[in-house]
Structures are given as C-alpha cells and as structure tokens.
Amino acid sequence: MTPGEIRRLYFIIKTFLSYGLDELIPRMRLTLPLRIWRRGLFWMPNRHKDLELGTRLRLALQELGPVWIKFGQMLSTRRDLFPPVIADQLALLQDRVAPFDGKLAKQQIEKAMGDRPVEEWFDDFDITPLASASIAQVHTARLKENGKEVVIKVIRPDILPVIKADMKLIYRLARWVPRLLPDGRRLRPMEVVREYEKTLLDELDLLREAANAIQLRRNFENSPMLYVPEVYSDYCSPTMMVMERIYGIPVNDVAALEANGTDMKLLAERGVQVFFTQVFRDSFFHGDMHPGNIFVSHDHPHDPQYIGIDCGIVGSLNKEDKRYLAENFIAFFNRDYRRVAELHVDSGWVPPDTNVEEFESAIRTVCEPIFEKPLAEISFGHVLLNLFNTARRFNMEVQPQLVLLQKTLLYIEGVGRQLYPQLDLWKTAKPFLESWIKDQVGFPALVRSFKEKAPFWAEKIPEIPELVYNSLRQGKQLQQSVDKIAHELQEHRVKQGQSRYLFGIGATLMLSSTLLFINRPDWGMSPGWLMAGGILVWLIGWRRTD
C-alpha cells in the first residue's frame, strides 16, 4: 500500500470506530490481540452512543464522502444484506456535496469543446451551478446557434483518481468481510463491490448517459405519460452533456402539485404505467427514478405528464426474464406458490436440482402473511424482496437487473402513494401484465414472430434447394468416409490378429531352440536355425503392426 492509501485507510477505520461501527462485527470474531491493537492504535471510543446503529452507519458514510455515499445508496437496495432498520437509514443518504468552483467547470467545458472559449458556443453561461452532486454538477446557458435554454452537466475534475483510490480500499475491506462476519461468504461481498464499481464507472461516462436519454426519449416520443428532455449530442463528450432545460414541479412537492390543480390519482397511476411500459414494452427502464430525478409538467394538470432526467443508470430485461417476472407477479397474487417456485427453477434463477416442494413451502411461509393486508396496501417491491430473499436461501444467484428493477419499483411505489395514498398498484398493473402475457403467447404472438422473421426467411428461402443439395452431398460424403474408416479399422484388426499369431510362433521357435541348445548340444546347427526362424517370424509380425 502507498502512504496515501495507508492514510486514507486510517481515516476510514477511525471514522467507523468513532461511530461505533465495530458493533457490526460479532465479538467472537475479534480476537484479544485484535481488540488490544484496535484500542492501542486508534484509542477511539464510540462518540455517538445515543444514536441507533443504522443512523450511525449513515452518518459515517456521509462523512467519508461521495464514493461511500453512493455505495451506501446501492447497499440500501440490497435488503438481503441488512435488516430493515439499517437498510431504511441507508436509503436516506443524499447525494449532495458542495459544488466545485464554477471557473473549473468552465475550464472543463472548454477542454471538452477542443480548448475553444465557452462564449463561442453558449450565451448567458451561469458560472454558479444550478445543482451539484458527487459525480457532476450542472450549469445553465443558452445555445448560441438557436438561443434555446440548456443545462450543461460537467464531470467533477480529478474525480476518477479519487474513485479508483477509494475502490481499492473498498475491495480490501470486502476481502475481510468473510473473516469477520459469520454469514460473510453468503453475502458475496466481492460481487457486491464489483457491481457497485461498474455502476459508478458507468455514471462517469456522460456519452453513455446521453445515449440512454436519447433512447428513453425515443421510446416515449409524443407520449402523454412521460417527457424526456432533448439531448444536444453534437455538444456531448465523455465529461460533458448538454440537454434541454426543463421547468417542472418536483414530484415530491405535493402542495405545489395540488395548488396547480393536478389530478393526483391519475398522476400516481401513470407513474405505475410508465414503469411497466418501460420494463415490458421497451425492455429498457430508468434505474434511478428517485424523487430528485422526476418532475411534473406545469401544463395540462388534468392530464398530467412526468418529466424524467438523469439517465445515468438504466436497466434492461431479456424476453425470458420479462415473461417469468410477469407470470411470477400474477401467480403470487393468485397465491399459486407452486407456480412461483416452478417459475424460479424454469428461469434458471435457482439451480435446476432445487427441491420444488421445499421451495414452495418456504415461499408460502414468507409471503402468505402479506395477504393479511388489503390488496391495495400490498407493495410490489416488497413482494419481489420477499421472493428474492427466500430464493437466495435456495442458492439463487444475484441477478443485477432484477435488483435494479426492485429498487426502481420501490421508488415508484413510494412516489405513487405519496401522491395518492389510496393507490392500488395491483389494480393498475394487473390489466397491463395480463395483456402483455396474452400478447406473448397464442396466435397473435405467432403472427408477430412470423412478421419479425419474414425478412430473414425471404432471404433464405431461395437458398433452400442449394442447402438441401449440399446437405445430401455432404451426407453421402460422410457415409463414404464412415465406410472407409470402418474398412480401415477392420483391416487393422485383422493385421493385429495376424501379428499376435506370428509373435506367438516366433516366441515358440525361439524358446524351442533355446531348450534344444541346452539339452541336445549334439544336434549341431539345428537349434541355431530354429532361433533364426523364430526371429524372422517375430520380425515379420512386428512389421505387420505398422
């Protein structure tokens, strides 16, 4: 480790100890020498004994900075790793940090634009940031070419070395988790850290975010449900993104929405519809739909429209995942736990040798109490959470796309019920899911599949006669090759049999000559001729083995 890494590691451990986070490690895992070393080296008692453990963990991560804040946010979605009291506190982590100097942001923009002055491309550039987060901050301006209002998102300068340094330390700490926690191996800490690192590095590439926003905008073009601001891709680079500036009401500002006359019931239901449309129709969903990234248009409040920003994190499901997920939801709400268990096995989410009866019983034990509540109060997100937590006991592999979907669904549910507490998610989603499943099977699906593959078959049908001829010719050639190999094998067997026969004769002659030479020396040269004959026959047999 470098001196800088040692200093940073010391600060991290010191921060954890000052918040009493060594309580997370069972005492039996801390040997006496380790406890003495911990006291002697740091001499750092818990200074926040009056706070709950989850609160102390949240405050410690906030003190450690942006990389750790985002790590905590990601861990809050993995409720299989922590009890609810800790996961709920981690969910409160806010990705808000002090802005960096606007002059540095201006330099970043000029560097991204080929070292040309900002004034050459933008008017009214505001050096004071509109918003600031751990990875980037946003400035406002107008495009010089058309006068449109835009926001310019700029990556923080020198953020990459900070991220790499902290990630190295997080990896080091993750390697210790299996040694310190009884359940450490099941938690797969290295896998969790790798997943986080990929997400974090993806957020550093604003070209990727721009492409995601363009895709999402295309998917909801002319839709009354969701508006995605236009991205000006000619001005984008890995460290800078320029997009249309929008004006809307923050989705969690319920008072402002009501004052604007917004139809709150329709708005809440549309949030659910937007989510399921992204997942099942488009196979491409916004993976960071927390309230800070969602606004509501001021226009037509009786036909409200969402505005979505910050597409740095997106998810997608393949066709099989979508079908199994939809059928899982429907089977669960029909209380068909056997079907839920079978779907987990069929999808490959759990090993194929899983005992379906035991799995069904475990799902029923965990999920049946949920139905004690009215259907309108049941949380889709917690349904998924309970299913996944149960499945992990049966060695379900971590499915990153499903973890991200579950996190997003929890956001959507939270926002929806904040807007309209009586929101019945199942009533809103069930027709959509049933319609989607019906569309995937039967005659309509067959017709659609034929249409999708028609160009392929139109190209291949003229080639069929030639393919048939080539197949027949290759079949004939293959049969000839097989016959030839069989004939050669038969010849080889015959030769081997003859060789063994000749070896036997040669050995007999040589043995006989030896006995005659010993017992009848008066026979003269006869034993010698027998020996020579035996050697000759043996050599002929040896030659036939080649």
Swiss-Prot record:
Binding, ATP: 130-138, 153
Name of protein: Probable protein kinase UbiB
Keyword annotations of the record: ATP-binding, Cell inner membrane, Cell membrane, Kinase, Membrane, Nucleotide-binding, Transferase, Transmembrane, Transmembrane helix, Ubiquinone biosynthesis
Domain Protein kinase: start-end pairs: 124-502
Active site: 288
Main location: membrane
PANTHER family: CHAPERONE-ACTIVITY OF BC1 COMPLEX CABC1 -RELATED, PROTEIN ACTIVITY OF BC1 COMPLEX KINASE 7, CHLOROPLASTIC
